[in-house]
Regions:
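Electrostatic cytochrome c docking/interface patches
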Residues: 36, 202-215, 283-284, 289, ...
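A structural supersecondary motif
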Residues: 523-526, 534-544
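Post-cleavage N-terminal segment of exported redox proteins
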Residues: 17-35, 155, 160-207, 250-254, ...
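Primarily short, surface-exposed interaction patches in extracytoplasmic proteins
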Residues: 39-73, 78, 82-113, 127-174, ...
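Sequence context surrounding c-type heme c attachment/ligation sites in exported
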Residues: 171-272, 533, 545
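Bacterial N-terminal signal peptides
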Residues: 5-15
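Short, surface-exposed polybasic-aromatic patches that bind anionic ligands, especially phosphate groups
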Residues: 650
Length: 664
């Protein structure tokens, strides 16, 4: 029994909440006026007024702009995930026009590499992988969805359309193959192929995963707990969870043909042969044995029709299922029947006799949705500054953190809608702001007032994501393949890694340019992800991931030094600097430019030249070690084997520097 005083306290708390009204995140964002600032010469675009206003209130000033080389490297890594080439750095430094930086930004947004960089962020949230998960972790064909994401981002598909096609592209009028492939977003759930699996339990668990992912990605909310009971903190009743469940409960999960251009070409050629042979059979006046031979040949040809790549998609059922609420989330304890619906605390769901998944998708993408734009621009902001305006980027509920700049968040959300939900427009706006272009150097005055840099008196220094560390190294070495799309590839990895799961898998390293593709194309096993990516905190794809963690361990340095792929990259970098420059000093400077985008200072040149001499001397007395390090490489003309080996060691040093794996 509660004491009377406790009951009164609870009732007072409930009354207080009622008086406060709806939680801020559940109210449609307003477009606030730009605040007045004192330092009027600093803002470049509206973002800066909101940031500067908060800084001035705290008696802080923004940091100076980053130097041009730092800024160029930063925006390259942020927008396309690759460092600028020495030629691009030189061209930018020589361009004195006032719009030089804006031209760089526009070129990067137009690059196909932009979709690869920002597609990786989305694939994390979509829990994309090339295997089923669970202990069997069988392979699956999902790369068509990955390529769809990259293509949609490169084409600057309006974000609302991007959302609708992934939630219900199969239900759009005259849905294309691409729109059906888009529904792979919710086929990224794990598939349990173990013996003794209860198929209905697995099907229900998949829907639970889809609701949880939709909640986190589209709403920045945690719906998992209302699977079993009313939300303890947010106004989401248990029954409303199963109203959303009803939308996904009407879907089948087929595998459909999604032929590539090359496969369509082979099929067309095959069909032409069938038509030609069929005509010959009909026109034949040959005797029975010869005619029979032609007919047999035709039958064989029809059976050998080239196969097409398949894709996992969503498809609406012809016969609807009845949806019931599960007591405490237990599918074996169904309760009352529920109809499809949406959380009542959010924007109104249009009245429809038989609402379906497409209606739900359009409701999610509605301009009246108070969360979609806020959550999306907040995640964009997070990628550029290390944390979002709302730091709990996947919890906009009452237990999440309050926005550090609430008026800026709302302004960005309304701006996103105003520019037609164009992600490229928002990226352009953010990276051309004075806020983004600040130096990341720490300042004592700002650290004292704002130790976590919440007010953004400077930029943030961030370690690169796992995939970008590999991609940047490949680009520096000159080995990076520009090939896009297609099935996953298998870059080298240490032996024995595939023995770690319950069932051994094979990993035959790719050859040719597939060996040096961007990491987004690396085959992604859930149970045994590529170790060089995992050690740098790539998510495991078992569930939705909207923010990368950043650890700092000795294993990371050892990976950059000794991983088979990075050894090949080091050899490629060494060969590149040797072949392109003649003196040691020129080669040191060139290697620095390739890896760090800048020239070394005199002290750095001295240290590296001294290291090079000591390494060469060591290899001259150890011919077997030299031979082992060089491996099967073609010898370089006019250079000793010991000197070549020393350059490989220096390349390993450059790729292992903190600066090489950091975005300033």
């Amino acid at each position: 029994m509660l004491r009377l005083s406790s009951i009164c306290l609870i009732l007072s708390f409930i009354t207080l909440l009622a008086e406060e009204g709806p939680h801020w995140a559940f109210i449609k964002p307003n477009r606030h006026k730009l605040p007045t600032v004192k330092q009027t010469d600093w803002p470049i675009n509206p973002i800066d007024y909101f940031i500067l206003s908060k800084l001035e209130n705290a008696n802080l000033k923004p940091s100076p702009a980053a130097d041009r080389i730092t800024l160029l490297r930063r925006v390259h890594l942020d927008l396309i995930g690759l460092p600028p080439t020495p030629g691009e750095v030189k061209s930018f430094l020589n361009d004195k026009s006032p719009d030089a930086y804006k031209k760089i930004v526009n070129n990067l947004l137009a690059s196909p590499h932009y979709g690869e960089r920002w597609g990786r962020h989305w694939l994390d949230a979509a829990r994309y992988a090339d295997s089923d998960g669970y202990s069997h972790d069988a392979p699956r064909v999902m790369w068509q969805y990955r390529d769809w994401v990259i293509g949609a981002i490169n084409s600057d598909m309006p974000f609302t359309q991007f959302v609708i096609e992934q939630l219900a592209g199969d239900m759009l009028p005259s849905a294309t193959t691409a729109q059906r492939i888009a529904t792979g977003f919710h086929r990224n759930t794990q598939i349990n192929t173990e013996g003794g699996v209860d198929k209905e339990q697995f099907r229900v668990d998949s829907i639970f995963d889809r609701i949880a992912t939709t909640g986190e990605v589209m709403f920045g909310l945690t719906f998992g707990c209302i699977q079993c009971h009313d939300h303890k903190f947010d106004p989401f009743p248990h029954v409303e969870y199963y109203q959303m469940f009803a939308f996904f409960n009407q879907s089948d999960e087929p595998r459909v043909e999604a032929p590539t251009q090359e496969e369509n070409k082979r099929r067309d050629e095959h069909n032409e042969k069938v038509v030609d042979l069929n005509a010959r059979v009909k026109a034949s006046k040959a005797k029975a044995p010869e005619r029979k031979k032609l007919e047999t040949e035709l039958a064989k040809l029809k059976k050998t029709r080239p196969r097409a790549t398949t894709a996992l998609v969503m498809q609406q059922r012809k016969s609807p299922r009845v949806t019931k609420r599960f007591i405490q989330g237990d599918f074996t304890r169904p309760s009352e029947v529920v109809q499809a619906g949406t959380p009542s605390v959010l924007h109104v769901f249009p009245k429809n006799k038989d609402p379906n998944r497409l209606d739900f998708a359009r409701w999610v993408a509605s301009p009246n949705n108070p969360l979609l734009a806020r959550v999306t621009v907040n995640r964009m902001w997070q990628r550029y500054f290390g944390k979002g305006i709302v730091e709990t980027e996947n919890d906009f509920g009452t237990q999440g953190t309050l926005p550090s700049h609430p008026k800026l968040l709302d302004w960005l959300a309304t701006e996103f809608a105003k520019v037609g939900w164009s992600p490229k427009s928002m990226h352009r706006l953010i990276v051309t702001s004075a806020t983004y272009t600040q130096s990341s150097n720490a300042r004592a005055d700002a650290k004292e007032v704002d130790p976590l840099n919440i007010l953004l008196a400077r930029q943030e220094r961030l370690r690169l994501d796992a995939e970008i560390i590999r991609d940047a190294a490949l680009a520096s070495s000159g080995l990076l393949s520009q090939k896009m799309g297609g099935p996953g590839v298998y870059p080298p990895q240490p032996p024995g890694c595939m023995n770690l799961g319950q069932h051994r898998k094979t990993w035959k390293a790719s050859s040719g340019e597939d060996r040096y593709r961007r990491a987004i194309y690396t085959y992604r096993w859930r149970a045994t992800p590529h170790p060089a990516l995992k050690v740098f905190d790539t998510p495991d794809a078992f569930s939705c991931s909207t923010k990368r963690l950043r650890s700092n361990t000795p294993l990371q340095a050892l990976t950059l030094l000794n991983d088979p792929a990075f050894m090949e990259i080091s050899k490629g970098l060494a060969r590149r600097v040797i072949e392109n420059k003649s003196s040691d000093k020129e080669r040191v400077i060139y290697g620095f430019q390739l890896c760090l985008s800048r020239d070394p200072d005199k002290r750095e040149v001295f240290i590296l030249e001294d290291f090079l001499r000591r390494q060469q001397s060591s290899f001259e007395t150890a011919p077997n070690e030299t031979k082992t390090l060089l491996g099967a490489q073609d010898p370089l003309p006019n250079i000793k084997a010991s000197q070549h080996a020393a350059w490989i060691m220096l390349a390993r040093v450059l790729l292992n520097t903190d600066e090489a794996i950091t975005r300033e």
